[in-house]
Amino acid sequence: MKFRDYLKDNKVSHWRDKYIDYEYLKNLIDNEYINAEILNSAIIDLPLSPEEQNNINKNNNNNNNNNNNNNNNNNNNNNINNNNNNNNTLKDGEQTNSNNISIPNQMAPQESSGEDEDDENENGNGVVGDEDGGDDDEIEMDELVIDDNGEIINITATAGSRVKVKKGINKGVKRLKKIAKNTNNRLSRMVSRSPKNKGLGSSSEIEGDEFQLDGGGISSQIEMVASNNITGATVFVPQETFQDGFIDQVNKVDIFFVDRYRKTKFKCVDLVGMIPFLSDNEQLRTIRNIDYVKQGFHDNYHYLESLESYKNLNLDGFYKILDKYEKINPRIAKECRKYLENTRLTSTNSPVRELSRRIKQIYARYFTGNDIKLANNQIRTNKQVNQFQNYIIGFLIGASAILIAQVIFKFYYYFPDVADSPKNSPMAWLLFRISSLPIILGTLFALMTKLWEKAGINYVFIFELKPDIKRSSSRYLMYGMIFVTMWLVVFNVYVDSISNKTGSPETSRYLLLIPLLFILGSIFFLILPFKVLAHRTRFWVLHKMSKVVQAPFVPVRFPDFFMSVQLLCLGEFLFNMQQIVCMFKFNDPLYSPSGVCFKHKAVIFPILSVLPFYWRVMQCVRRFWETGQFFPHITSAIRSTFSIVTNILLWVANNYGNKEWSWIKILWFIINVVGTVYKLYADFTVDWGLFLNYKTNKQWPLREKMVFKRKWVYYVAMSFDTFFRFVWLIVFSIRQGTSYKLDHPLFLFWFSLSEIAWAAQFIFFRVESEHVQCADTYSHFKDIPLPFSQDYKNYMEEKKSRYDEKKPHHHHHHDNNNNETKDGSGGTHHRRNLSNGHHPYDDDDDDESIDSDADSKDLNLESNSEFVDDEGYNQRKNSIISSIKKIASTQELNSMNRISSHPDLYSTMQRFAGHVPDSNSSMPRMYSHPDFNHPIPRVLTSHVEVNPSTLRTVPQHRLNNIPNQRIISHADINPQHLRVGSPRVEFNSTVQQRSPHGEIQSSMIRNHSRADLNSSMQRIQSHPELNSSNRNQVDPNSPMNRLITRADLNKSR
């Protein structure tokens, strides 16, 4: 099993947002592979022509013999350079913004033969470089003045009489820019090709150029976009690193863990203080108060167990994610592991376990007579109760399925034709239908509580239920299934009774008492005033129903709104109840359209139908008066107002309309359609936030906060909501278009059931919406009110005052074997084990006694292993964080391997970029990299940079269809990528393809011998300015003198 699935299955629902975000950290690790490729600029390699390569090899072989002499010259010049180092060395950062850019002529195009030049013009390979016929024994220095558009406006000689200005410099620079632009355009076309054209072919030629780009297709995470300027200001968007995300996650878990522990300990201290309080107050030592203290110890012990499991689960996740990251970056992973081990999550002596042990000892000391085994059995979670309830639920579901099948079989067996059924059967169907609606609604609510618990929705907090009472969704569902089974049993009895056709009509008439007695019995059970049969739930329902009736004169809370919605869907129940009263009053039990009650035009009928909607409107008005918010309170009021108007118009049309389509009925139809559309729109916006907050909502078109991550759940719910809202229109169309009036009892039952289903779905998602819209819902909690709060407060104040007086105190020593207490004077007295014997009843078989002589030493919860937040702890954390940042910054320098910001090197790059780079770009940040301490020609002849501002991200669906090859967008200029033997300026290649074994192999990197470097070095070292004999002739202000006087440039290669 994968850890993310294990984490999901073992989360505590109320702490769901407080766990490690494992997927988030894993994504940060995955981004490490991509960041090395897309953070910086792309560098493209332009291969040399065969003639140029042969010339370079020839020059390298000829210059090998002169290397030793050049090295000796370097050694002789070291002393002179060292003496003048302080005066002639140019500091880093000087002249970086100058428009006069001084560069070695090695970077400039040199004179070549006409034949070679023509070839270059034809092939597009006119990269500025050292051609055949160039002198290897001298270096020319040119100063180029470049304007903002990259055009050369002035060329002057600054290196003395031996400096020679090359004729083709302007032409060569323009040709270089043209090649770069063509390369960029070609790459754009290659990336943006259709996925069907997978193969570009290894011999793909760039149009108008002779060089080739290897690859059989490009899989890239960048898009080289053609633009007027291939280079521009570099803008880097900072991305969150793994170490930052890891530290944030560790801090989140650590703070939540310690905070919850301290809150639990504070509650335990209060419970411990109640033990001597109850011991000293015999009047308050009741079963209820003792149960309160015992239950408090139970709950806190279980809470600490959950907290310990929370810690262990998060630690497993952190260690697993570190094991993954260690394969990529072991140094930072080691520091992150050190940071984790320095937190309070990895404390050796866990205060949580110590507090759990102390709670168990105190519980055994004062409630089980020092019986640790009995205390363990009483204080641990009793899972057998839930298992028993689940067994009962399964048994009742099976019994209900059998009863339903039996009812259907018997009815159609005894009455194959509906006309053969008893004359009073419509009345019986009515009675059974209206009695089943509240039962089904209550059972659906029990099922919803189970789903809310699974989804982590805190319905106890939303419904404002008392937190000191244990609730179980399985228990609710068990009660619901009991009523469903009883209803089916009564229904079976009625079907068996009416199937006896030998009975007289009077006898069959009395059979109506069967469903009627069941309804009366259910109502009596609901209002039963005794504390039996789920009395808390029954009293809560009656209390909320009374508050609905009192609206708008009482404050309205969410439970009151919930109860009003239940009454809305029970409108059919209220309407049928008034008809039952009418039938018994007029002795018309046939329940037919020709009966008295159907023809009766009592005004009470529409009033009872619209009464639930009126209560709902009054609740909305009250909420608007309290909050002043038009949405959603007045919005909901308008919904209910539509229902009131349509019900009144329907009653008027049925009783006073002369025609089938009178103007009243037409008005009713129009208002009903408009009202249904408005209700549907209100449902979508209030419950699901559909099409709201387009600019700021990341989850658009749904609301931003959702409990269920699968969006299809909400869309399915919207579909059902639309169907339930327009059921009336379907029924109306069938009745108007056909002769069938849809008055069959079974159809009416399903029609009523659709109202129940709508109400259940509406409440389910409204509670879910209320849950996610509460700020920090999981941190909201209600403290359990003390049953003796004022008395306990007075007792603690008196105890504190006695402590402040510092009276002499005798230490008592307990003898657990003989229940005697020895005081300081040597006398003894017996402890009083007060029980609840003075009460005329006992609740359970458990020992309800509490030790009346509580010892303060036994009740001490302090221990040596406590969580600390001292200055030393914070300093250790900050020290590790600083170490992680230092290592990360060092690795960033080593990974990019870019050109340093030495003024002359930086100016060289500016010459070919045609602009002054942004101060935030990566190049000015790269100072004093070890690779830059080598002789300058090694870097100057290596590459020119393509600006990252021309890079764009390719959509993921396009990347998935472009296989095999990748354009790396990072300019990893390390020595193995540099073409140090070429005196030309080139685009260095990091176009790479993945081998079958997963290793990245460079397709265009050329390994040159050491002679390549020596060849370039010889050209610099053989320059007269470098010669000691001509040292005095060199202008001290020349750029070349500033370079070669640095000690590190004169070191032997």
Swiss-Prot record:
InterPro entries (UniProt xref): EXS_C, SPX_dom
A GO BP entry: phosphate ion transport
Polar residues composition bias: residue spans: 95-112, 1023-1040
Spans annotated as Disordered: 54-137, 799-871, 1023-1053
Membrane topology field: Multi-pass membrane protein
Short name of one Pfam family: EXS
GO cellular component entries: plasma membrane
Low complexity composition-biased segments: 54-88
Localisation: Membrane
Keywords on record: Membrane, Transmembrane, Transmembrane helix
Family the UniProt entry places it in: Belongs to the SYG1 (TC 2.A.94) family.
Record's protein name: SPX and EXS domain-containing protein 2
Organism in which the protein naturally occurs: Dictyostelium discoideum (Social amoeba)
